[in-house]
Amino acid sequence: MPLLDSFTVDHTRMAAPAVRVAKTMKTPHGDNITVFDLRFCRPNIEVMPERGIHTLEHLFAGFMRDHLNGDGVEIIDISPMGCRTGFYMSLIGTPDEQRVADSWKAAMADVLKVTDQRKIPELNEFQCGTYEMHSLKEAQEIAQHIVDSDIGINQNDDLALPKDKLAELHI
């Protein structure tokens, strides 16, 4: 099995909250696609609660588009990481990390303004696969942590695992 890009960086040295360009690619038609690692928690130290991250997934997707889309950028998808320490965001365009960080913080401020769980988009059995697994309170606690924090920038070169370590770890 090929080694995926996300597993070539040292998770023990990742700062959080922080933005990282996880991958860039060009489509056959010349469009730039960028995948960002939006790291909410330090890997293996913190984890977002499942109800909170699920609610945040519903809210974050729209709010982030409100703040980041435009001027050569269009978000394709924002999805939570299985490890529950962050989200991956795929988009068309190449915004710099600071623009992404500023939009992320603004989106989290919007999450804090949601007054009632009934205002969570697509919170019903027809549009959500686990519609009863939500917590606005937990989502807002996660959002408050981001609003209260400085969002850093994780650089791939600073986090790269050495080739000998990758060889040792690869199964």
From Swiss-Prot:
The UniProt note on the cofactor reads as follows:
Binds 1 Fe cation per subunit.
Cofactor(s) needed for function = Fe cation
What positions does the entry give for Fe cation binding? H54, H58, C128
> What gene name does this entry carry?
luxS
Reactions this protein catalyses = S-(5-deoxy-D-ribos-5-yl)-L-homocysteine = (S)-4,5-dihydroxypentane-2,3-dione + L-homocysteine
Task: Give the species this sequence originates from.
Answer: Pectobacterium carotovorum subsp. carotovorum (strain PC1)
Q: Which InterPro entries match?
A: LuxS_sf, Metalloenz_LuxS/M16, S-ribosylhomocysteinase
EC numbers for this chain: 4.4.1.21
Q: Which Pfam families match?
A: LuxS
Q: Which NCBIfam families match?
A: PRK02260.1-2
According to its UniProt record, this protein's enzyme class is lyase
Presence of keyword DNA-binding: no
Instruction: Reply yes or no: does the keyword Lyase apply.
Output: yes
| Family according to the record | Belongs to the LuxS family.
Record-given protein name: S-ribosylhomocysteine lyase
